[in-house]
Design a protein with these regions (language model features):
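A recurrent flexible, glycine/aromatic-enriched loop bordering the glycosyltransferase active site
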Residues: 150-170, 186
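Short, well-formed alpha-helical segments that are part of the catalytic scaffolds
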Residues: 13-26
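Non-catalytic, C-terminal membrane-associated alpha-helical segments of glycosyltransferases
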Residues: 226-232, 236, 240-286
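Short beta-strand-to-loop acidic/aromatic patch adjacent to the donor-nucleotide binding site
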Residues: 86-96
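Glycine-rich, basic loop-to-helix element that forms the pyrophosphate-binding segment
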Residues: 66-83
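Conserved donor NDP-sugar-binding/catalytic core segment of glycosyltransferases
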Residues: 101-133
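Short beta-strand/loop segment that forms part of the nucleotide-sugar
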Residues: 32-41, 65
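Acidic donor-binding loop at a coil-to-helix junction in glycosyltransferase catalytic cores
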Residues: 186-193
Length: 286
């Protein structure tokens, strides 16, 4: 089986990072190194996090950068360049592996075909996740795995390029061959890379059995800002997003969510859905 390292950008890390690191050390297939790309050294608790790796076969590397130096694409890319593993798994510091088989399932997904350039995990809602966000998790991360390539664009549209660095594994040789993540982006470095990979003839694997716990309860204003960043990143990369637009997928999600709310006794949440959807749409088009 391929050797894997994990790359995690951090900023003011806390309890979730500690839980994430503990779960990584418990994996049925151990990783070689965890590479932390930490923004601002003053927020890093070395005693708390680095002591977890004492006596472990998995090693920890911590690289500190300034907040002004952070970029979603470049910072992760620099972390991958510090690895010599066959596979680099990108994770965010607020996700937690669901079980001991996360790494194993990601590696098996990459081995499904020589064409697979990346594999991303299923995101399960946290215990405090709201009803609407819980349904959104299920919509975007179903229970069935699949491979996605250029031949699926007519069926899947923009979701052909969907990939999430909340937890995604990359074959390092293909990653470097394609130039890696874009070096300047406020968002979406994962989908931009996936789009380029698909256009180059590779596939993206959705590994439903590789699972992490990760969800957010965004306010309307937070959702607006998030979708503004999403819209900017898509506008900056028409070579990826110019042919396959995301509006149709968003409308489908709203319709299916509304139907699910009514059918499952949550009709009183319809105003919340309207506000959240309006914030997403406004942010995207600002």
């Amino acid at each position: 089986m391929r050797k894997a390292d994990v790359i995690i950008p951090t900023f003011k890390p806390g309890d979730k990072l500690e839980k994430l690191l503990r779960r990584l050390l418990e994996q049925s297939v151990p990783v070689g190194r965890v590479i932390i790309m930490n923004t601002e050294e003053k927020y890093w608790d070395a005693e708390r996090f680095e002591s977890l790796f004492e006596g472990e076969d998995t090693k920890l590397t911590v690289c500190h950068i300034l907040q002004s130096e952070f970029d979603h694409g470049r910072t992760r890319h620099e972390g991958i360049l510090k690895s010599d593993a066959d596979v680099c798994i990108c994770m965010t510091h607020d996700c937690v592996p669901y079980d001991r088989n996360l790494v194993k399932e990601l590696l098996e997904a990459l081995d499904a075909s020589e064409r697979v350039a990346a594999a991303y995990a299923r995101q399960l809602p946290a215990a405090d996740c709201g009803v609407i966000e819980r349904y959104t998790r299920d919509f975007n991360y179903p229970a069935v795995s699949r491979l996605k390539g250029k031949e699926d664009e007519d069926e899947l549209g923009i979701k052909t390029y969907f990939c999430s660095n909340v937890c995604a594994a990359y074959r390092r040789d293909i990653y470097l061959k394609l130039g890696g993540f874009t070096k300047k982006t406020i968002f979406n470095e994962d989908m931009i890379f996936a789009g380029h990979a698909v256009e180059a003839g590779y596939q993206i694997a959705y590994a439903a059995d590789a699972q992490v716990i990760h969800s957010h309860n965004y306010t309307a204003m937070q959702q607006l800002h998030r979708n503004f960043d999403l819209g900017v990143s898509q506008a900056d990369h028409p070579e990826v997003f110019g042919r396959l637009h995301s509006e149709g997928e968003g409308i489908r999600l709203v319709k299916k969510t509304a139907k699910w709310l009514v059918e499952n006794g949550h009709a009183l949440l319809m105003p919340q859905l309207v506000m959240a959807s309006g914030s997403k749409y406004a942010g995207y088009w600002l």
